[in-house]
Amino acid sequence: MIQEYQLRVLPEIAANEQRLKEYLSEEKGLNLRNINATRILKRSIDARQRTIFVNLKIRAYINEMPEEDEYEHTVYNSVEGKPQVIVVGAGPGGLFAALRLIELGLRPVIVERGKDVRERKKDLAQISREHTVNPESNYSFGEGGAGAYSDGKLYTRSKKRGNVDKILNVFCQHGASAAILADAHPHIGTDKLPRVIENMRNTIIECGGEVHFQTRMDALIIENNEIKGIETNTGKTFLGWLAANGVTIEAKGIAVGVRLEHPAMLIDQIQYHNKNGRGKYLPAAEYSFVTQAEGRGVYSFCMCPGGFIVPAASGPEQVVVNGMSPSNRGSRWSNSGMVVEIQPEDFISGELKMESGELAAQQNAQLLAINPLLSNSQLSTLKTQLTPLHFQEELERQCWLQGGRRQTAPAQRMLDFTRKKLSFDLPESSYRPGLISSPLHFWMPDFISKRLSLGFQQFGRTSHGFLTNEAVMIGVETRTSSPVRIVRDKETLQHVTVRGLFPCGEGAGYAGGIVSAGVDGERCAEAVANYINQQ
């Protein structure tokens, strides 16, 4: 007999299967000897009160043995000789699109500007060691995309539960722990995810697909408003090419701020209401904050308990930071993005203007180099479309200047920031390239710094001990999502003016994390299959 139960137990019971069996036997009147195994289907922590509980949904196998695998297998057959589909980018959107195309009997050919996930690791080490950034292989570009070496966090707010479960099961099929199927906030870990990504690539190749690394798509070949192919490794900038050649794009809202790092013990003490921290049976504590400050959202983003802050620049003259956590979340620090919502209209008001005249001239020159026939009116329109991107680039450059023109990051103690004081020293940090004390409140746009300060003060009121000089703000967090969207039809998922082009995933402006990008990749693969079947 197989029975499912909802349980509310202490952490030490949830962490030990034998104790869980004993609890089940006592609470449900079962014979302990007849409970052969238990499987946790859902798990979440209730830390609202001083006594912490773990909510479980479990499956008990009574006088039966459990099935061997805890996840559902997807069958991938050979697609040798099948119609070919070019997939640009080997991030989660591209990888899941490719796997879904194979399911649908189509042959994916992936082109990826960066290196494979193993070779990429060497370039990441150079950023911290030598302060040099390879524009083609870094924390943003390469196999696995930005998520491969950031955190491996698989939480999404997507309401398409079936699609989310499919994504998690595919990860398990390729080597991820089945625990991700149960956890409320599933997490693979940046130490485990590269192997999973490598296995996904191997499945694609074994089925007859192709994966080409160090192959950057720079332009599209378009005839009569229909895509015919791509140009690679030409040196052009792709978004600039799209804008200059009339392929419809649009500015979208972004969120910009800092990485905030606390001692992990302090966050554990706050969240678990215990001066001794999390103890033996609880994971490093998470938090989530959101508030409104002068009409714009201020919120935590991609919180990494027991994690590290890493340099995420993708080119020269940039300092960008991101967070990551290993699977055990065992670091001495916990960090999170703390960002302010920015809408496209905020740039029009002029309050967010950072752009220098020299930079504006360079941007116009780049567009004219791609398309010399652009009029002043067209240049003005393109500038509006690309303004969030250019703002992001200029803020990252300012951060590089403030950091001493290296990957050293400008930083300020949290309480000092709210009091507009320069920090005379900084706490120890997980950020390996190093920190330099800097008045973030002074050089960051007032639109951002003012709202961050108000947000921090609000978070400090609701979570005693959170607003503290033990915490350090590290600049800047700018890559929460793409600042530009390649516009597609809501029903067909095809570009609004170019037939056969299906913008997909985070880079195209349609996702905000690993799982949402994977879900979007599968949806776009299905849309491509429908398009091909109608030809």
Question: Predicted regions: what is each one?
Answer:
Residues 2-54, 58-149, 153, 157-170, ...:
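Residues forming the flavin
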